[in-house]
Amino acid sequence: MRITELLTKDTIAMDLSSSDKNGVIDELVHQLDKAGKLSDVPSFKEAIHNRESQSTTGIGEGIAIPHAKVSAVKSPAIAFGKSKAGVDYQSLDMQPAHLFFMIAAPEGGAQTHLDALAKLSGILMDENVREKLINASSPEEVLQIIDAADDEATKEEEAEANENSTVSTDNSNQDN
């Protein structure tokens, strides 16, 4: 799965105006709804808030990844928003969040939201990617940055898989 299968131009908000966590959630939910991804906005918003009440999705390094898997979602999607000023998102590192990725998955969506969460987290560990996203000036640029980082992550996963299969082949030869 590629992030840009779920993140599209119509789910990107380049300049969030909210100054608090609830406002950011409202803006990102609106972005998903405007793109036709939600069938029940209040239910989806409630699911996001319920998830946030369990523990913050402000993971630190200026990133928040609110997410919910609920029947109010028509099709899996990711909304992206950024705030140059930063928002107190009650992040784990107590720093303001600047980059927001809201993952919306339908209730029967299998592993989609977990796969997206894992892949996004991996991509966003790269400080260079975060910096490029903060400075991006258009939805197209955001998609290019994510796509390039996704390509890089895929190459690294493939190289690691090849390395592991070589190691296991080497180990099995030692038994003979």
What is each of the regions a protein language model found here?
Residues 1-176:
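Cytosolic covalent-transfer regions centered on His/Cys nucleophiles
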